[in-house]
Amino acid sequence: MLRRRKRASPTDLYRSCLQGGDCIPDVQNKFEGNTIADWLLKIFGGLVYFGNLGIGTGRGTGGTFGYRPFGAPGSGRPTQELPIARPNVVIDPLGPAPIVPVDPSAASIVPLVEGAPDVGFAAPDAGPAAGGTDIELYTITNSTTDVGAVGGGPTVTSNEEFEVAVIDAQPIAPYPKQLLYDSTIAATFETQINPFINPDINNVNVLVDPSFAGDTVGDYFYEEIPLERLDIQTFDILEPPTESTPTQLGNRFVSRARDLYSRFVAQQPISEPDFLSQPSRLVQFEYRNPAFDPDVSLYFERDLEGLRAAPLQEFADVVYLGRPRVSSTSEGTIRVSRLGTRAALTTRSGLSVGPQVHFYMDLSDIPPEDSIELHTLNVTPQTSTIVDDILATTTFDDPANSLFTQFNEDVLTDDVEHNFTESHLVIPATDEENDTAINIINLRNIPLTVGMNSGDISTTLSDYNILDASLIVKSNVSEQPLFVLDYSDYDLHPGLLPKRRRIDYF
């Protein structure tokens, strides 16, 4: 007989969803309040108010005390509305007492005890005191101390039908303070200050109430204490720095102890040299890479099918190695550290969770700096005086007045005589394309009178004269100008232009 298996309850399904199981949308939305009805209540709840109609998502029992029908009250003790009576006295508002200014000319009589004094020993009808006049009783009210406050408040009670009743309770006014003065008692107190009798009271100051006339007796004696600046402090360095550019020791030790030397980080010393050059070879088997950069963080991804043991047992299950950190220890060694993470637990989503391990390797000791004592090379027992005649000469250099020095113009005259005998005169003549257009006449050993015109400056060399003019042969070739026109008077049809082929080179 086949029986249908009962489906799990919505509560069990939602608990399974929270633990990572399958989440059914309708069950999840019901428990998290994301159904359509919940959305409508959230949207229209701010627009429409149904507070007095009892509409809600509760059990429908009317709250903790149930529903109360409209109209006449139900069974039970009938309720009676009590009138609210207004208190007869003025109720002071709660809060701090008002600040009353103090008059400096007022009497400074402050009672020593709180409350009313005991005046039972002196009755008003007892008659005058023995051996004195009548006793007068005064009531003193001080505005600075007699500040009214709330002495009590109304007592509020409630009955079974939750009706509030207010009981009229009036606070008791505070009793006025009374002081008894007896004119027969006259006590005089004298104070004698004599520094010769009592040398310890040289700096006694007598202060009198400012409402009466008084004098200040005594001098101000004080001790002169030299003040020193607190920001300038001298201290001695206990040990010399071990680095050329040392940083603050406090920040370095605090950051190192917080990150690497925490109680939640395991400490693992390493002695393999590959930890400095290529630490990935200690985690997984691989070849030596000459282009490996050791100053980076390393992430290792492993497949469960190809899981292998690490080359070094200390690096088993390591999935992350941080960048190297160089520091110095208290023993004076240089330490290279890397912060790693082991994959101790892997969830179904692929998240790896594991402890952190501090891998470190101590390289070498930092030798202390040798202090070399410097000796004096030469010690002169007495003062020596050296006199030099060259240093005794004083020379003044005045560059400002050196421009006005008089010079002789004969210094500018050239003493070398130039001779142009057996000279060769070459006259080059070329066009714009550097082609020779005019024949060069070679005038060798021909005395000529050559004139050179250069603008407004004309120089004539009269050392050479033409002896025989028949030596100059004139050319019979007629000289005609040559015009070169470089332009075209037509346009070629585009169809006659050769087609350009595109050749792609790979």
Curated annotation (Swiss-Prot):
* Molecular function GO terms recorded: DNA binding; structural molecule activity
Report the Pfam families cross-referenced here. Answer: Late_protein_L2
Localization per record: Virion; Host nucleus; Host early endosome; Host Golgi apparatus
In terms of InterPro entries, this protein maps to:
Late_L2
Output the PTM entry. Answer: Highly phosphorylated.
> Which positions form S-S bridges?
17-23
Q: Where is this motif: Nuclear localization signal?
A: 1-8, 498-503
Q: Which GO terms describe its biological process?
A: microtubule-dependent intracellular transport of viral material towards nucleus; symbiont entry into host cell; viral penetration into host nucleus
Q: What GO cellular component is one of the record's annotations? A: viral capsid
Q: Which domain of life is it from?
A: Viruses
What keywords sit in the KW lines?
Answer: Capsid protein, Cytoplasmic inwards viral transport, Disulfide bond, DNA-binding, Host endosome, Host Golgi apparatus, Host nucleus, Host-virus interaction, Late protein, Microtubular inwards viral transport, Phosphoprotein, Viral penetration into host nucleus, Virion, Virus entry into host cell
**What is this protein's function?**
Minor protein of the capsid that localizes along the inner surface of the virion, within the central cavities beneath the L1 pentamers. Plays a role in capsid stabilization through interaction with the major capsid protein L1. Once the virion enters the host cell, L2 escorts the genomic DNA into the nucleus by promoting escape from the endosomal compartments and traffic through the host Golgi network.
What family is reported? Answer: Belongs to the papillomaviridae L2 protein family.
Could you describe the subunit structure of this protein?
Answer: Interacts with major capsid protein L1. Interacts with E2; this interaction inhibits E2 transcriptional activity but not the DNA replication function E2. Interacts with host GADD45GIP1. Interacts with host HSPA8; this interaction is required for L2 nuclear translocation. Interacts with host importins KPNB2 and KPNB3. Forms a complex with importin alpha2-beta1 heterodimers via interaction with the importin alpha2 adapter. Interacts with host DYNLT1; this interaction is essential for virus intracellular transport during entry.
Q: What is this protein called?
A: Minor capsid protein L2
Q: Which organism is it from?
A: Human papillomavirus type 50
Q: What's the source species' lineage? A: Viruses, Monodnaviria, Shotokuvirae, Cossaviricota, Papovaviricetes
